[in-house]
């Protein structure tokens, strides 16, 4: 189902109607995608931080933030401003270049990964044919930044935290990639748009979660580990490592780690929504909505309605998963480092391999149901 809304085409037509040439309109469009990504990511982080604070307060029978704006909604902005004006301290014996570069290498790949996230048929920044592969490639850069930050701090706690972060990320990237590969195999495409379209034929019955329940669980567990969320927050375990690789960081550099962690959480939830929960798709087929309203499926009214509802559905599914991740953080104990690595290498990796082989077999036997 095509929403008929293409951001770039609509923007260029608008500027050309105002008298600007096509060349100028294309040049003005170039910086907009990244601005849209940054805006969406920052808004997503602000909402997620506020949710985390209120849910954690409820779990601990507290009130939580309530003075900064209505219901404390402006508290994340107050925290950000506080970190922004704090002094930027670099330890005397730290490696200045690596110490500064580490947080940047952690944040930039996460932000760039938002380029492939679709909120509708044409409502995404970059519709590249290898979107999933691009995301996996970008996510593999983050452990380098974490290890670099821990090493450059010249602190034993920071180094241990960086080593843990790198080991954890590498251990869980492989089963995560294998779980995604099963989805790619069924969709016959690496494009996030194609993966969502393949799930929108029969409403919620065609969502990949029903055909890949094991893959869904593997992906979700690995995503939480990649985000370093409890019960997998070993790299920054306060009782053992003070703050892990973040120990020597303050001010804006610390804020970059904080920002990257929450952007990664929202991104992971978006990817689960896209890969397993139909993305912008509705629980019922779009054709039923068009028939109920007595409109053609290609009419402008239906196009606008489906595009708007598609954004709402994507955000709703995403924050449902964010809510689940926050609940898990405040209700589960931290695992040990040996348990963490055993889970990744001895359980999730073999299970993800078996799941991939089983998916390939089902695709051969039941091609109509598994994308043959």
Swiss-Prot record:
A Pfam family in this protein? NADHdh
Question: How does the UniProt record describe the way this protein sits in the membrane?
Answer: Multi-pass membrane protein
Which stretch is the leader sequence?
A: none
> What GO cellular component term, any one, is given?
plasma membrane-derived thylakoid membrane
- Residues spanning the membrane: 27-47, 97-117, 128-148, 176-196, 204-224, 270-290, 308-328, 351-371
Question: Its Gene Ontology molecular function terms?
Answer: NADH dehydrogenase activity; oxidoreductase activity, acting on NAD(P)H, quinone or similar compound as acceptor; quinone binding
What are the record keywords, sorted?
Membrane, NAD, NADP, Plastoquinone, Quinone, Thylakoid, Translocase, Transmembrane, Transmembrane helix
Where does it live in the cell?
Cellular thylakoid membrane
UniProt xrefs under InterPro entries: NADH_UbQ_OxRdtase_su1/FPO, NADH_UbQ_OxRdtase_su1_CS
Q: Which PROSITE patterns match?
A: COMPLEX1_ND1_1, COMPLEX1_ND1_2
NCBIfam families associated with the record: PRK06076.1-2, PRK06076.1-5
- How would you summarize the oligomeric state and partners of this protein? NDH-1 is composed of at least 11 different subunits.
**What is this protein identified as?**
NAD(P)H-quinone oxidoreductase subunit 1
Species of provenance? Prochlorococcus marinus (strain SARG / CCMP1375 / SS120)
């Amino acid at each position: 189902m095509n929403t008929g809304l293409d951001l770039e085409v609509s923007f260029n037509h608008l500027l050309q109607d105002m008298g600007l040439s096509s060349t100028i309109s294309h040049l003005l469009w170039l910086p907009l995608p990244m601005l849209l990504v940054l805006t969406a990511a920052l808004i997503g982080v602000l909402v997620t931080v506020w949710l985390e604070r209120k849910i954690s307060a409820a779990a601990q029978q507290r009130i939580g933030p309530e003075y900064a704006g209505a219901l404390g909604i402006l508290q994340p902005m107050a925290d950000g401003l506080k970190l922004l004006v704090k002094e930027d301290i670099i330890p005397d014996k730290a490696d200045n270049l690596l110490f500064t570069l580490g947080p940047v290498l952690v944040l930039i790949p996460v932000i760039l990964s938002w380029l492939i996230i679709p909120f509708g048929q044409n409502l995404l920044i970059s519709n590249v044919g290898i979107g999933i592969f691009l995301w996996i490639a970008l996510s593999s850069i983050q452990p380098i930044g974490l290890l670099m930050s821990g090493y450059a701090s010249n602190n034993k706690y920071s180094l241990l935290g960086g080593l843990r972060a790198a080991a954890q990320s590498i251990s869980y990237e492989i089963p995560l990639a294998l779980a995604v590969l099963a989805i790619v195999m069924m969709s016959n495409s690496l494009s996030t748009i194609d993966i969502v379209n393949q799930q929108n034929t029969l409403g919620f019955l065609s969502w990949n979660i029903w055909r890949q329940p094991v893959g869904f669980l593997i992906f979700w567990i690995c995503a939480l580990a990649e985000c370093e969320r409890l019960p997998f927050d070993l790299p920054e375990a306060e009782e053992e490592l003070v703050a892990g690789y973040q120990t020597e960081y303050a001010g804006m550099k610390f804020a970059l780690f904080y920002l990257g962690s929450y952007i990664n959480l929202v991104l992971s939830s978006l990817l689960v929504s896209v890969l397993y929960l139909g993305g912008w798709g509705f629980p019922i087929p779009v054709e039923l909505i068009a028939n109920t309203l007595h409109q053609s499926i290609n009419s402008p009214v239906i196009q606008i309605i489906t595009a708007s509802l598609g954004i709402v559905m994507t955000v709703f599914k995403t924050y449902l998963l964010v809510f689940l991740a926050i609940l898990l953080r405040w209700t589960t104990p931290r695992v040990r480092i040996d348990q963490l690595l055993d889970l990744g290498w001895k359980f999730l990796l073999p299970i993800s391999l078996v799941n991939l082989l089983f998916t390939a077999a089902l695709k051969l036997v039941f091609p109509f149901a598994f994308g043959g």
